[in-house]
């Protein structure tokens, strides 16, 4: 027997599994809305013209040192250009900008995932936080990254499934009441993945003030600078606000060039740790500790991709061309949102679809049930995540009407039935969940629970429960199988009622004791 004979199976990454299934599908009308990569109106990858020109220039120079080692921290020219782009120093050539630069430790990473991981590893080792707060929902890889560094996470409300809006009140009230000094709060700078919903400038100010008042550590994931509005300076607004208006607190930023330069496979990113004004003398020490972690993992970031980024950012002609390329991508996605909304409206598809045009960036939560998503895949060959997150760049002028009609026709499919879930090892549903209590924020979607179930779990969808005040809510009930009876049952508020209409109480539902649910549902 192998030494790994007792190794538990794990659930494969949903996005990559869907992409593999899409590539194996030979249906002529198949549509891929799962992968977070930009596609042109012809449905093909679009190498940015600015990137192609940069590659031509680099190749023509035939630099014999192009493939040599740089430094553990990374290429100095790339890091300076990346830092200036992220923190807006291009427009701040004065004494204040010079002073702010001295507070920032920057290192090159293996794209945005590597920046998130390095930051999580560094903070877990030296700040030793008790909790990291993640938005509900968030990018799925955030859970894995923080699990690997053994920092428990809790969720703050972010998305209201009842109307497809940003749940600012739920976020603020939860963090105000439950977050503790020293906790990390993970924020996405723009084009929130997966919801496509961003705070307004005033809401960002309120969030920053809460971090200041509660002594929370902001960790900003900036994977889509330029994708939200087509303007890099607009999309890094919260980063610049923290830097300039909250100089007395530390923060960090994970930066990626995968999306905004289309360098998905080149893995180009940076991690920036921003010291407060009193700690700026520690910058080199912070860099040394980051380099120690880098040396033990990947030694240095890839050179080929960072050379391209450096050339684009430092060449005025290419930089201007790149800005135009980003605007083209951003505006096409906006046009596809409107086209999908217009067709659903024309078809008189039940429900409100205005959230599709109100969301920004690459992704949208369409608002379909898992059963409807499955129907889209099996009957119409349209691939999107079970949460109904869709990459809007997968839409184009030749398939948007087909997708809209398919969505319209899936409204006839209810979301019922028993079915087993695949075994999954690892963490419980919510780290820090107290026994006998389940948190049910208004608007919680079903996907928030199935993604992190214990091993050997079954679930029943859309179980109606009449509360003491007479309000009926629809719950997904999760309970262990006979082989795992030691695990307690969990519930999650369903996002769709049986006929496809939202079923929520008129007042925000915050907590329900499991003892009440046990008695009602006879679990």
Curated annotation (Swiss-Prot):
Pathway: Secondary metabolite biosynthesis. It is an enzyme of class 2 (transferase). The keyword Cytoplasm applies. It catalyses: L-tyrosine + 2-oxoglutarate = 3-(4-hydroxyphenyl)pyruvate + L-glutamate. Its cofactor is pyridoxal 5'-phosphate. SUPFAM superfamilies: PLP-dependent transferases. Nonribosomal peptide synthetase that mediates the biosynthesis of usterphenyllins and uscandidusins, p-terphenyl derivatives. Within the pathway, ucdG is probably involved in the conversion of L-tyrosine into 4-hydroxyphenylpyruvate (HPPA) as a precursor for the usterphenyllin and uscandidusin biosynthesis. The pathway begin with the biosynthesis of 4-hydroxyphenylpyruvate (HPPA) from L-tyrosine, possibly by the aminotransferase ucdG. This is L-tyrosine:2-oxoglutarate aminotransferase ucdG. The gene is ucdG.
């Amino acid at each position: 027997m192998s030494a790994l004979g007792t190794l538990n199976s794990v659930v494969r990454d949903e996005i990559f599994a869907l992409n593999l299934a899409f590539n194996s599908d030979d249906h002529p009308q198949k549509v891929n809305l799962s992968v977070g990569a930009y596609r042109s109106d012809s449905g093909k990858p679009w190498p940015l013209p600015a990137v192609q020109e940069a590659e031509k220039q680099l190749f023509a120079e035939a630099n014999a040192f192009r493939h040599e080692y740089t430094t553990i921290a990374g290429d100095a020219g790339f890091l300076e250009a990346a830092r200036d782009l992220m923190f807006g120093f291009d427009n701040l050539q004065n004494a204040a900008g010079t002073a702010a630069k001295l507070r920032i430790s920057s290192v090159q990473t293996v794209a945005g995932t590597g920046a998130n991981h390095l930051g999580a590893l560094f903070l877990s080792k030296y700040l030793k936080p008790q909790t990291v707060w993640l938005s509900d929902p968030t990018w799925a890889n955030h859970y894995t990254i923080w699990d690997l560094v053994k920092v428990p996470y809790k969720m703050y409300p972010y998305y209201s499934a009842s109307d497809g809006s940003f749940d600012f009140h739920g976020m603020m009230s939860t963090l105000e009441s439950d977050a503790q000094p020293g906790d990390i709060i993970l924020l996405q700078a723009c084009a929130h993945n997966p919801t496509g919903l961003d705070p307004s400038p005033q809401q960002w100010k309120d969030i920053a003030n809460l971090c200041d008042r509660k002594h929370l550590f902001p960790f900003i994931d900036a994977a889509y600078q330029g994708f939200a509005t087509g303007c890099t300076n607009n999309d890094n607004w919260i980063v610049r606000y923290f830097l300039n208006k909250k100089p007395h607190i530390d923060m960090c930023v994970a930066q990626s060039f995968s999306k905004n330069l289309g360098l998905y496979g080149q893995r180009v990113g940076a991690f920036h740790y921003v010291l407060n004004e009193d700690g700026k003398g520690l910058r080199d020490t912070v860099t040394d500790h980051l380099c120690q972690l880098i040396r033990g993992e990947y030694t240095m970031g890839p050179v080929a991709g960072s050379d391209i980024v450096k050339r684009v950012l430092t060449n005025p002609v290419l930089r201007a061309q790149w800005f135009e390329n980003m605007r083209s991508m951003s505006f096409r996605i906006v046009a596809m949102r409107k086209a999908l909304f217009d067709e659903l409206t024309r078809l008189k598809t039940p429900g409100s679809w205005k959230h599709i045009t109100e969301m920004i960036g690459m992704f949208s939560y369409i608002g379909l049930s898992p059963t409807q998503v499955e129907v889209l895949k099996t009957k119409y060959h349209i691939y999107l995540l079970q949460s109904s997150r869709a990459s809007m760049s997968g839409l184009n002028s030749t398939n948007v009407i087909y997708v809209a009609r398919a969505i319209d026709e899936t409204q006839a499919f209810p979301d019922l039935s028993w079915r087993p879930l695949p075994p999954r090892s690892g963490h419980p549903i919510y780290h820090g969940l107290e026994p006998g209590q389940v948190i049910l924020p208004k608007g919680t979607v079903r996907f928030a629970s199935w993604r992190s179930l214990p091993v050997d779990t079954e679930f029943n969808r859309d179980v109606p429960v009449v509360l003491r005040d007479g309000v009926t809510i629809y719950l997904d009930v999760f309970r262990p199988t006979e082989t795992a009876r030691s695990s307690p049952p969990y519930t999650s508020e369903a996002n769709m009622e049986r006929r496809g209409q939202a079923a929520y109480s008129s007042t925000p539902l915050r907590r329900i004791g499991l003892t009440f649910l046990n008695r009602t549902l006879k679990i």
